[in-house]
Amino acid sequence: MELKKQAQKGTIISEKFIEPENYRVILLNDDFTPMDFVVAVLISIFNKSQEEAETLMFKVHKTGQASVGIYVYDIATTKCFQVLTAAKNNNFPLQCKVEKV
């Protein structure tokens, strides 16, 4: 994205804005975390609807993983940390990872 400004003496100044890179948060399947907990995580951390959360949970269960959102780096890593913390606090081995898009 580029913005152009005109300085006081007629000089045009060009400012370029670099778009931040996007990162995908991926939820990983395991054999111990209850499906209801995964749905609750998707609703509370990723703001998914009940229907979206259930669809994603089944995708994780059937394929081993699913992308649950794309965010800038800081938000992606924060959400992944929130998932890991919630899982640990509830004694579940649920894992997630962050990958550059």
UniProtKB/Swiss-Prot annotation:
GO biological process terms, semicolon-separated: protein catabolic process; proteolysis
Domain of life: Bacteria
Function: Involved in the modulation of the specificity of the ClpAP-mediated ATP-dependent protein degradation.
Assembly and interaction partners: Binds to the N-terminal domain of the chaperone ClpA.
Family, per entry: Belongs to the ClpS family.
UniProt-listed PANTHER family: ATP-DEPENDENT CLP PROTEASE ADAPTER PROTEIN CLPS, ATP-DEPENDENT CLP PROTEASE ADAPTER PROTEIN CLPS1, CHLOROPLASTIC
Protein name as catalogued: ATP-dependent Clp protease adapter protein ClpS
Organism lineage string: Bacteria, Pseudomonadati, Spirochaetota, Spirochaetia, Spirochaetales
